[in-house]
Structure formats: structure tokens, C-alpha cells
């Protein structure tokens, strides 16, 4: 499928007379795509260049040889295993909130650590700006989504970054870079390689390429936003296709609810939908603790999301649906 209509949102347009058109594009992207690209998002190109440099150098120095050894063993045994259960990627994970583990990751030099800390702060700010834009689009009080995400005992979201490399694969017809899945969390910000493609999303039954654009940030709607919006926004199946040439860098940052935050459809949206349809209020999704969902997701990541939502109904918690204060 052609990617020419893929939604690209220029955040500069949100500041002027073209704001209504830009907000309409944002709504369409969240409701009908689940994934879109941001330009002029406020993170400097200089910082993004440093992030790319330090991570590609880290992979070359410390992870490339390890992956080659893993790949050799994998290719030797691929005939005897189910390739649909394999991912052709080299990854490590940085935690930022509620506590950071950057100082504990082996082999990261000081430049890499400080660069990634700086990048994480910028991404955290961008995620929160985007959440407020989504509140505006949805007709929710400003700050509502952040308040839900920070509704756990420590008053913080869960925020972390998955740093991935997808090296050349000699048998891309057998092994995916990363198998198809939706993301479990809230809002995902991806800084992807602009020289090597591979990211695809499922749109109208067809896989469509997400075009690499230099210095853009790809935004992905996670399962929790689907729940909070009572299905108005949708998380989307996406995957990474292994390539025979080029090493693809992918830096995905996940701004998620706190582990014990309670997730449920926003009452204002449920009521609004009922009024528009002139029917009784109906919460399509259950109320649950985010960590309970994650515990299930870890086992069911590469399966359909709908059974996960259904499974959460069996442990649905009883709670008051009073408005969440945002001030």
C-alpha cells in the first residue's frame, strides 16, 4: 500500500491560523491510523544528531559482535525452530521514571549517558504537550490524561526508552525484525533511522510503510489511550520488517501510566458518546490497574489486543467514576 497519505503533523502549524486544520489532522491520525509523524516538535536537530551518533557508536563497539554470534546460532537452527517466534533485533532498555537506571547500564560511556538523559527530558516534555493536545481534541479538561497516568501512589508516570538496532538479515523472508503487536502503554515517541526503513503499520488490512523522515518523531497510540478514550482512539498493529542491507536504529520512548495507576474510560467521553447516540451510557472497556495489564501483556504481546481487554474484565475493579481533579 502506498504511504503518500500517511499523516504527518507539523507542530508549528498549531501556533497560528492553521491550527484548526492541524488539530483536525491530529484527530484523524489518532482515530483512523493510531500512528503519525511529527515535524517541528521542539527537540533540536543537534540533540537528535548526538543521540544517533552515541547510540550507533555504542552498538558498533559493544553489541554488534554479540549480535553476530547470536545471529550465527539462530540461522543455524532456524530450520528447527518456529521463525514466527523470533525477532531480529538487538535491544537494551533505559528507565527514566519513576527511577532511572541509566547509571547502571553496562558499557555506556559518560557522553552516551548524559545525552540520553537530556533526550529523555525533552521527550517527557513532548509527551506531556501531546497529551494536552489530545485532551483538547477529545474535549477533556486540560491535564486530564497526565493526571490519569500519574494517578498511582508515587504520582509519577512510568517512562522508559527501548534502544534497538535491526542489523542486516540474510533471511528476511523467514524472520521478522519485530513481530506484529500493539503497544501496551500510553503514548510512544519513536526516533527512527531515516536511512534504513522497516517500520510498517496495518491499515485497512494492508501493511503500509512508515516513511523515514529525518529529525521527525513518530507517535504511536498505545492500548491505554484506547481504553481511556473508550475506543475513540485506537492502538494499531505495527511491525518491523528485517532488511538485507543496512543497520536500522530505533529509539522508542514509552510514556505510560504509573504501575498502580487505575485505567478506565473517561466518564466525560462515555457520557458525551451516550448523548450523541441518544442511548444509555456504555463503558466498552474495563477498569483495571495498569500493572495487571502489563503482567498479561508480557505473555500475550504478539497476540490480538481484544482478548487482553476481555481478560481484564474478569479482574475489573470497582471504583468511583468521579471526575479526576486536574488542578
From Swiss-Prot:
Q: What processes does the entry annotate via GO biological process terms?
A: ethylene biosynthetic process; fruit ripening
Xref: InterPro entries: DIOX_N, IPNS-like_FE2OG_OXY, IPNS-like_sf, Oxoglu/Fe-dep_dioxygenase_dom, Plant_2OG-oxidoreductases
Reaction catalysed?
Answer: 1-aminocyclopropane-1-carboxylate + L-ascorbate + O2 = ethene + L-dehydroascorbate + hydrogen cyanide + CO2 + 2 H2O
Which key words tag this protein in UniProt? Answer: Ethylene biosynthesis, Fruit ripening, Iron, Metal-binding, Oxidoreductase, Vitamin C
* Pathway field: Alkene biosynthesis; ethylene biosynthesis via S-adenosyl-L-methionine; ethylene from S-adenosyl-L-methionine: step 2/2
Q: Which family does it belong to?
A: Belongs to the iron/ascorbate-dependent oxidoreductase family.
PANTHER family recorded: OXOGLUTARATE/IRON-DEPENDENT DIOXYGENASE
Question: What name does this protein carry?
Answer: 1-aminocyclopropane-1-carboxylate oxidase 1
Q: What is the taxonomic lineage of the source species?
A: Eukaryota, Viridiplantae, Streptophyta, Embryophyta, Tracheophyta
Amino acid at each position: 500500500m502506498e504511504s503518500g497519505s500517511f499523516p504527518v503533523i507539523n507542530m508549528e502549524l498549531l501556533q497560528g491560523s492553521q491550527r484548526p486544520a492541524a488539530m483536525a489532522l491530529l484527530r484523524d491520525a489518532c482515530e483512523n491510523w493510531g500512528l503519525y509523524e511529527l515535524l517541528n516538535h521542539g527537540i533540536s536537530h543537534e540533540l537528535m544528531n548526538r543521540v544517533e551518533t552515541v547510540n550507533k557508536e555504542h552498538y558498533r563497539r559493544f553489541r554488534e559482535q554479540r549480535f553476530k554470534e547470536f545471529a550465527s546460532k539462530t540461522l543455524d537452527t532456524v530450520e528447527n525452530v518456529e521463525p514466527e517466534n523470533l525477532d531480529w533485533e538487538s535491544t537494551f532498555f533505559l528507565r527514566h521514571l519513576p527511577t532511572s537506571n541509566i547509571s547502571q547500564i553496562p558499557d555506556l560511556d559518560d557522553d552516551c549517558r548524559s545525552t540520553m538523559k537530556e533526550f529523555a527530558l525533552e521527550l517527557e516534555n513532548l509527551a506531556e504537550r501531546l497529551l494536552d493536545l489530545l485532551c483538547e481534541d477529545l474535549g477533556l479538561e486540560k491535564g486530564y490524561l497526565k493526571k490519569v497516568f500519574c494517578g498511582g501512589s508515587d504520582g509519577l508516570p512510568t517512562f522508559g526508552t527501548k534502544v534497538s538496532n535491526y542489523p542486516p538479515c540474510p533471511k528476511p523472508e523467514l524472520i521478522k525484525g519485530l513481530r506484529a503487536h500493539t503497544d501496551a502503554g500510553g503514548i510512544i515517541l519513536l526516533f527512527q533511522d531515516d536511512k534504513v526503513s522497516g517500520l510498517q503499520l496495518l491499515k485497512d488490512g494492508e501493511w503500509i510503510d512508515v516513511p523515514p523522515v529525518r529529525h521527525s518523531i513518530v507517535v504511536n497510540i498505545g492500548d491505554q489511550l484506547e481504553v481511556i478514550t473508550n475506543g475513540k482512539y485506537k492502538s494499531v498493529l505495527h511491525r518491523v520488517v528485517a532488511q538485507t542491507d543496512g543497520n536500522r536504529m530505533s529509539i522508542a520512548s514509552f510514556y505510560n501510566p504509573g504501575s498502580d495507576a487505575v485505567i478506565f474510560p473517561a466518564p466525560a467521553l462515555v457520557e458525551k458518546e451516550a448523548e450523541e447516540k441518544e442511548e444509555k451510557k456504555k463503558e466498552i472497556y474495563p477498569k483495571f490497574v495498569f500493572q495487571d495489564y502489563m503482567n498479561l501483556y508480557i505473555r500475550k504481546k504478539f497476540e490480538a489486543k481484544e482478548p487482553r481487554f476481555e481478560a481484564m474484565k474478569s479482574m475489573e475493579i470497582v471504583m468511583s467514576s468521579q471526575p479526576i481533579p486536574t488542578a
